[in-house]
UniProtKB/Swiss-Prot annotation:
Region span, G3: 370-373
Protein name: Translation initiation factor IF-2
Organism annotation: Ruthia magnifica subsp. Calyptogena magnifica
Residues the record lists as binding GTP: 324-331, 370-374, 424-427
Region span, G1: 324-331
Sequence segments annotated as region (G5): 460-462
Record-level Gene Ontology MF annotations: GTP binding; GTPase activity; translation initiation factor activity
Native organism taxonomy: Bacteria, Pseudomonadati, Pseudomonadota, Gammaproteobacteria, Candidatus Pseudothioglobaceae
Every tr-type G domain range: 315-482
InterPro entries according to UniProt: EF-G-like_DII, IF2_II, IF2_N, P-loop_NTPase, Small_GTP-bd, T_Tr_GTP-bd_dom, TF_IF2_bacterial-like, TIF_IF2
G2: annotated segments: 349-353
Keyword Acetylation: no
Keyword Nucleotide-binding attached: yes
One cellular component (GO) term of this entry: cytosol
Localization per record: Cytoplasm
Length: 815
């Protein structure tokens, strides 16, 4: 049993603190009341106690008069100390120290004996455990040897069984005549049956020919096809895309069977159609085979593996994205930080492109990315969240948390990047910051002063209040997270924006994320590639190179890439062309697969859409990101009755080719921040093509909504204006059947729509042809008045029927 300081203090009749002090004086530190005391430490403790007891006996002498102690002082004088007499007897006082010393000695001896006994028990347990381990090891070795012997015996038995048929065959072969032995050895299975082996001119005897014929028949029967007893299960490796015929070959089945399974799954395909990996795996499992998803190593994968950055990483500036709802002051806040006036140059005062800038703050460089807040630019915000290190979520203090604020929070949480909330417009009156914090907390964005981990800083983009605190928070976050990247390597990055600019060509805004981008490098972005001809920073300065976290404009690509495409620098133009061609081929294959995936479904959809009105649109925008956002927004306007179809989209001005395509497809041409040239305008006038120009995205969307609303069928509603009950029916050769009625409710008007009800069931619906009061034709009859009603093209009216007079009202519908 291991002793602790607590148990030893009870044995020694001392406090735990005294025992700890004695151990510390003896050189054993770091003990507390629950610390275990080893045997060696117990010996040290006992030794210290013995020394203390002996020193006390030598220093003190007990007498009836008190305690005397003598010691030599520095001057050699003797000092005598007398203890005050106690009320107890002198005998008890003299015996007390001796009793204490004896008790200590006894306790020490007991503790030492207990320690020795514990050590002996531990040694005995260790010896017993070692003996058990040795026995287990011996038993395991014996068992292993027995298993090995059994396996050898089984193997010998199998060999004997395998040799037995061979011996029987050999015995049978030996019993045959010599001329018939070994006639079927080797590959000579087509030996002539009626010719002797050694003499071709001599025929075999009839008996020998019969035996040889039987042997050949047996041999042929052994090699004949036999139907499998159990179904053969294949393991099918399936790539990302596979043809139906190829899949059937891998499963060793007919292509028609595969088509039947596909049809049962609701997929209409032909033999040469390409299906995706998931569909193919379902088909394989449905047909009883095992499917394995195989990932082919493509040219692109090999290139990316080769370009993986390796080397010493160095600190880089943080990339900060500003996100939030439209008109919450994102660009205005960035303007104050940059001391610029960007919002003055934006149409409608809202951001419609991704802007990237670098700012110096207290000697530190920070890269800012400004994103649009309009709902149509959701993809832009998503791309920015994935390309950033820190997100500044701007929330207007007077407006609170809005839909795009919540959407931005979801993008940030999906990307897993740190977030700082800037509560803007605190210079306005009547704001409630705590309410904003409470609403944000419902979306798992909890302020630090509420026990969360998100810094929330009140700022004003108008007065500049709190901006310094916001910059300090960014610098602190960057210092804690230690953002770094490899500098000396081929550059990698992300396309932020791309456009076609007159006089400059294809201009691509990229964010360098690792490596160094140099002028003259071979760059690939999406489907486009080319040599870097010029690098320009956010201030318009031409650079020779760009390092990580720098946003730059690059000239030299073969086309305009899509926003969000990965940028790679390769060592040769041949490799760049090879990767670009591979990506284009893969994209064409995906588009073809998409078109051929369900032809029957498309056919049925077209039949259903025969009554659907369609607005064809040809869209041209200034940058690729805006074009993508507009396409998504326009297609989102489609309903069951009216839809928008973007027949073509692109970047750059509107040209003559666009007008020709619009005339052919009867499309409306929409230009976003672009204009048509003179030739295009003339062609549009001749062809009757309508061109609309826009600089604000929601104006474009509202106009398209208005056009679609004009295509919607009006909403019809019915208004009952009167009810009359039929009292009698008069027959007239000239007028036909006339119903004598009493108007019970409302007004009955001539030339109105009516319903004839019998027992509350509609039996006829038509027009009220004639209305008479006595012999006079009247236009209307009010409630409580008798009248005669003639119904157009209906002669089965009877007394007791009800005539319901109503009108239909058309209302124009809007989206």
């Amino acid at each position: 049993m291991a002793h602790t300081v607590q148990t030893l203090s009870k044995l020694l009749k001392k406090t735990p603190d005294e025992v700890i002090t004695i151990l510390a004086n003896a050189g054993v530190d770091g003990k507390n009341s629950d610390s275990a005391i080893s045997a060696e430490e117990r010996k040290i403790l006992m030794s210290s106690l013995s020394k203390r007891s002996s020193s006390k006996s030598s220093m003190f002498s007990f007498s009836k008069t008190g305690i005397k102690s003598s010691a030599n002082s520095a001057s050699g004088a003797k000092v005598q100390v007398k203890k005050k007499r106690l009320t107890k007897s002198a005998t008890a006082t003299d015996e007390q120290p001796e009793i204490a010393v004896n008790e200590v000695a006894q306790a020490v001896q007991v503790a030492l004996d207990a320690g020795r006994d514990a050590d002996k028990k531990l040694l005995a347990q260790d010896a017993k455990r070692l003996e058990m381990v040795r026995l287990q090891k011996t038993q395991a070795e014996v068992l292993k040897a027995q298993k090995k012997t059994v396996k050898q015996a089984q193997a010998q038995e199998i060999e004997k069984k395998a040799e037995k048929p061979k011996m029987i065959d050999k015995f049978k072969e030996d019993k045959k005549p010599k001329r018939l032995r070994n006639t079927l050895n080797g590959n000579n299975t087509r030996r002539q049956l009626h010719v002797a082996r050694h003499n071709p001119n001599r025929k075999l005897k009839k008996k020998d020919r019969t035996r040889l014929s039987q042997k050949v028949q047996e041999e042929q029967a052994q090699h004949a096809f036999q139907k499998p007893i159990e179904k053969v299960v294949h393991e099918i490796a399936i790539a990302e895309n596979i043809k139906v015929t190829e899949l059937a070959q891998k499963m060793a089945t007919k292509a028609g069977e595969v088509l039947k399974v596909l049809m049962g799954m609701g997929v209409m395909a032909t033999l040469n159609d390409v299906i995706d990996q998931d569909t193919a795996m379902l088909v394989v499992e449905e047909m009883g085979h095992k499917s394995i998803a195989s990932v082919e190593e493509t040219v692109e994968d090999v290139l990316i593996e080769q370009l993986k950055s390796s080397g010493n990483e160095k600190a880089r500036p943080p990339v900060v994205t500003i996100m939030g709802h439209v008109d919450h002051g994102k660009t205005s806040l960035l303007d104050y930080i940059r001391q610029a006036k960007v919002t003055h140059g934006e149409a409608g005062g809202i951001t419609q492109h991704i802007g990237a800038y670098q700012v110096q703050s207290n000697g530190n460089t920070i890269t800012f990315i400004d994103t649009p807040g309009h709902a149509a630019f959701s993809k832009m915000r998503s791309r920015s969240a994935n390309a950033t290190d820190i997100v500044i979520l701007v929330v207007a203090a007077d407006d609170g948390v809005m839909p795009q604020t919540i959407e931005s929070i979801k993008h940030v949480q999906t990307a897993g990047v740190p977030m700082i909330v800037a509560i803007n417009k605190i210079d306005k009156e009547g704001i409630d910051i705590d309410k904003i914090k409470q609403v944000l907390s419902t979306h798992n964005v909890i302020s630090e002063d509420w026990g969360g981990d998100v810094m929330m800083i009140p700022v004003s983009a108008y007065t500049g209040e709190g901006v310094d605190a916001l910059l300090d928070a960014i610098s602190l976050t960057a210092e804690v997270l230690e953002f770094s990247a490899v500098i000396k390597a081929l550059a990698r990055g992300t396309v932020l924006e791309a456009r076609l600019e007159k006089g400059r060509g294809k201009v691509t805004t990229i964010l360098v994320q690792s490596g160094t981008l140099n002028k003259g490098d071979i760059m690939i972005a999406g489907f486009e590639y080319g040599k870097v001809k010029q690098i320009v920073d956010d201030k318009g300065k031409v650079l020779k190179s760009a390092t990580p976290s720098m946003p730059v404009e690059v000239l030299g690509l073969s086309g305009v890439p899509n926003s969000g495409d990965e940028v790679l620098v390769v060592d040769s133009e041949r490799k760049a062309r090879e990767v670009a061609d591979f990506r284009k081929a893969k994209n064409r294959e995906a588009q073809l697969q998409k078109q051929q995936a369900s032809k029957m479904e498309n056919f049925l959809m077209k039949m259903e859409e025969s009554n659907v009105s369609t607005v064809n649109v040809l869209l041209k925008a200034d940058v690729r990101g805006s074009a993508q956002a507009l396409i998504e927004a326009l297609e989102g306007l489609s309903t069951d009755e009216a839809k928008v179809k973007v027949v073509s989209s692109g970047v750059g001005g509107i040209n003559n080719t666009d007008i020709t395509l619009a005339a052919t497809s009867n499309a409306l041409v929409l230009g976003f921040n672009v204009r048509a040239d003179a030739v295009a305008r003339k062609t549009a006038d001749n062809e009757g093509v309508r061109i609309e120009y826009y600089s604000i995205i929601y104006n474009l969307i509202d106009d398209v909504k208005t056009i679609m609303s004009g295509l919607l069928s009006p909403e019809l509603s019915e208004n009952i204006i009167g009810i009359a009950s039929v009292k009698s029916v008069f027959r007239s050769q000239k007028m036909g059947d006339i119903a004598g009625c009493m108007v019970e409710e409302g007004v009955v008007r001539r030339d109105s729509l009516i319903r004839v009800l019998r027992d509350s069931v509609v039996i006829f619906e038509g027009w009220l042809e004639s209305l008479r009061r006595f012999k006079d034709n009247v236009n209307e009859v009010k409630s409580g008045t008798e009248c005669g009603i003639g119904v157009l093209n209906y002669t089965d009216i009877q007394p007791g029927d009800q005539i319901e007079v109503f009108e239909r009202i058309e209302r124009i519908r809007t989206l």
